[in-house]
UniProtKB/Swiss-Prot annotation:
Pfam families reported in the protein's UniProt record: SelO
Keyword Transcription regulation appears in the UniProt entry: no
Name of protein: Protein nucleotidyltransferase YdiU
Disulfide bond residue pairs: none
EC number: 2.7.7.-, 2.7.7.108
Function text: Nucleotidyltransferase involved in the post-translational modification of proteins. It can catalyze the addition of adenosine monophosphate (AMP) or uridine monophosphate (UMP) to a protein, resulting in modifications known as AMPylation and UMPylation.
Protein's organism: Anoxybacillus flavithermus (strain DSM 21510 / WK1)
Keywords noted in UniProt: ATP-binding, Magnesium, Manganese, Metal-binding, Nucleotide-binding, Nucleotidyltransferase, Transferase
Active-site residues, record numbering mapped to chain: 249 (proton acceptor)
Gene that produces this protein: ydiU
Amino acid sequence: MNANWNFDNSYARLPERFFTRIYPTPVSDPKLVVLNHSLAKELGLNAEVLASEEGVAVFAGNRVPEGAEPLAQAYAGHQFGYFNMLGDGRAILLGEHVTPSGERVDIQLKGSGRTPYSRGGDGRAALGPMLREYIISEAMHALGIPTTRSLAVVTTGEVVMRETELPGAILTRVAASHLRVGTFQYAGRFLSKEELQALADYAIKRHYPNGEHASNRYVFLLEEVMKKQAALVAKWQLVGFIHGVMNTDNMTISGETIDYGPCAFMDVYDPETVFSSIDTQGRYAYGNQPYIAGWNIARFAESLLPLLHDEEEKAIEIAQKVIEQFPALYETYWLQGMRAKLGLWTEEAEDKKLIGELLHLMYTHRLDYTNTFRSLTLEEWHFCEQELRDWYTRWQQRIARQDMTKEEVYECMRQNNPAIIPRNYRVEEALAAAVEHGDDTVMERLLHVLSDPYAYMEEQEEYAKTPEPSDRPYRTFCGT
């Protein structure tokens, strides 16, 4: 029996300045903590072999499967607005696995040792942050939001030094690719036009093959990435997800959410909500995310300028015409999603005002974002405040004007308003049990209820509860 790995490594065929070939650093005593059986099945992999000693050795970096070509990717990026040379400092791409259906996915080991891009770091990861990424990335997938996935987490048998000694771990991340805006910034700043063109052609072939026949394939690439990112960030906003570190190296060309370091979900609705301990200025606050996405797309456009037109002025003009569409594009996706959350399948000019009024009421009355929509969906709008009751009446009048039965309206809402999100305090409970006490059952229960967030199951009731009020704000940390 074998695991059914099927590697074909197209990124490794790019010019060599895009990566460094390097093997993972072996670890002393790897142990499997969690394996994603459903994802393994989707990938055509044998879960039984993956869970064996041989499979765990692959997840730990102690064994490289046949056909893999391990490498660390080079990229740059704006981090909190400042440009830096970066790269995979603690992650190694084993290669690209091609599934039985022909889908190509990256298999990356995160926390697998030092690389030439480690910049003084130890190349390792702690168990808590790796389990956190596993939980939240799988929850995001269940919510219907494009995301990298998590195949497994193993402990290494070694400790990593952060504020204190922590158990070391490695996450196996699965992605459509790890091409980033920062990959293009690296090529645009440090490499030749020919190398930049090779990267752009590769991205088009891998992610946007229709662009191979476009009149200007590089304008097409810019437009498609912009659309994907506008749609992605709209989906984040619709569920109250705050990424926390929207640097350009964390914006994928594929349109998947990547890097779950300091992310969290908003409880009480407040556009200024920030959880990340390092985001002291609120650059990546909930309400800023659409603007930052547009800013990042502008950086992507800058990196593509040499390919858009031979004359720089004309290239800039072309880029500006594309990126100035981002705000309207984002709003279209967001309004479409908000209408669905309110059971509105027709469009009326006053819809934006109705939505804005609800958000304002949530803000002034400090209402929980997720549970407000949940209350509407379950017809449990039991508020005493007159302005909340008045808004409810206006909403009822609005849904009555469309040709849908009441049952159809509420079914639409159930499909678009999750009964449950990964509440920050629930995630922390699961991590504390797993990391401090070696008890994975809390995490397993949480993963189970998060696996079908639109089910409105009785067992989700407990997990839908908001956290107890606290004087201390919830803070997230990068885990690096």
